């Protein structure tokens, strides 16, 4: 599952860089619509990447201390945990 998330992140990042290069191209410096479109696209993708970060890293990768899991050894502590994925 982590592989697919990293793959999706890489594809979206490459598409974002391609879109940034296309919209910031100096062929038409007088085109204000191109700059507005670029800013809207960057705003959309930045919020989308932040959303992906919060969903994956802050929700699905938590280790909860629950009944019925495996042992994780810490210095002087032993937790009985299970790893949950919500995505």
Swiss-Prot record:
UniProt keywords, alphabetically: Kinetoplast, Mitochondrion, Ribonucleoprotein, Ribosomal protein
Protein name per Swiss-Prot or TrEMBL: Small ribosomal subunit protein uS12m
Record-linked InterPro entries: Ribosomal_uS12m
Record carries keyword Metal-binding: no
GN (gene name): RPS12
Role, per record: Protein S12 is involved in the translation initiation step.
Keyword Electron transport belongs to the record: no
Chief subcellular location: mitochondrion
Family membership: Belongs to the universal ribosomal protein uS12 family.
Subcellular location: Mitochondrion matrix, Kinetoplast
Gene Ontology annotations for the cellular component aspect, listed alphabetically: kinetoplast; ribonucleoprotein complex; ribosome
């Amino acid at each position: 599952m982590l592989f697919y998330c990293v793959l999706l992140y890489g594809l979206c990042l490459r598409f974002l860089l391609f879109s940034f290069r296309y919209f910031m191209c100096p062929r038409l410096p007088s085109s204000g619509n191109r700059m507005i479109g670029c800013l809207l696209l960057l705003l959309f993708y930045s919020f989308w990447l932040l959303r992906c970060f919060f969903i994956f890293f802050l929700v699905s990768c938590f280790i909860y201390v629950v009944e019925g899991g495996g042992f994780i050894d810490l210095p002087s502590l032993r937790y009985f945990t299970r790893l949950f994925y919500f995505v």
